[in-house]
Every structure is written in structure tokens, then in C-alpha cells.
Amino acid sequence: MWIYGPSGVGKSTYARATYPNAFHKTQGKWWDGYIGQENVILDDLDSDCLAHHLKIWCDHYACSGESKGGTIPLLHRNFVVTSNYSIDQIFEKHDAEKIAAIKRRFKVIHMTAPFKKQETEELVDELSV
């Protein structure tokens, strides 16, 4: 899931409310501290440096993540990115094929106004289908 929109609309709050026990991924390739959580949140992505990794981490195939001293299996089912930028905006310097590959891996939510709890529950139900 890719949640984007202006600052202050509750993107991070929405992600944390939807996946309260998620692993909070840093903006780098390292997965230190990950212990098999089903949900991962990459909050406030603001650079295109992870394009290659996102294609791997957000695909439906099994993959590994790098931790200091080795690799670990990534067992997540849901990967959430929050950003002020859309996929097109953040990866504008990449070729169309790479952007399309990233878009295929995400359900996109454009938040333009603060969300309400009921709307969040309805959206979670819709995305679970």
C-alpha cells in the first residue's frame, strides 16, 4: 500500500492504526530488528534511492533482507509506504518500465484531508478484499 498526500493529513497515523504491530522500517536497505512481523511500514519516504529494493520487498515472492552481519528471511504480508509524494513524483528520474513495476506492487491511496476512524475502517475492509 502506498499512502501519499500533504503533510498533516494523517498518513502515518492511518498506517499505524491499520497495522498497530508493524515493523517500522528505516529508509535504507537494513532490516535490523525485524523478527518476522507480518506488516511493515516505511514512513515518510522522500527519496528514490530504494527503487530496486522496493521492487523486491513488495513483490509477492519470498525474499531476504540485509541485516548487519547477514541476511534474514522477510515474512511480511503487507508493506506500507507513506510519503508526501506519489510513486510518479518520487521516481520521476527512473524509466517508465521501473515506475510501472513499482506501481504494480502497490495499492495507492491519495489522502487529501484528515481521515476519520470510520473511513479508515471502511478503507481497510475494502483493501482486504
PLM feature spans:
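Conserved beta-strand position immediately N-terminal to the Walker
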Residues: 1
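Conserved glycine(s) of the Walker
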Residues: 5-11
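Short, polar loop motifs at secondary-structure junctions
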Residues: 8, 26-30, 84-86
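Hydrophobic positions on the alpha1 helix immediately C-terminal to the Walker A/P-loop
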Residues: 14
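AAA+/P-loop NTPase substrate/partner-engagement loops
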Residues: 21-53
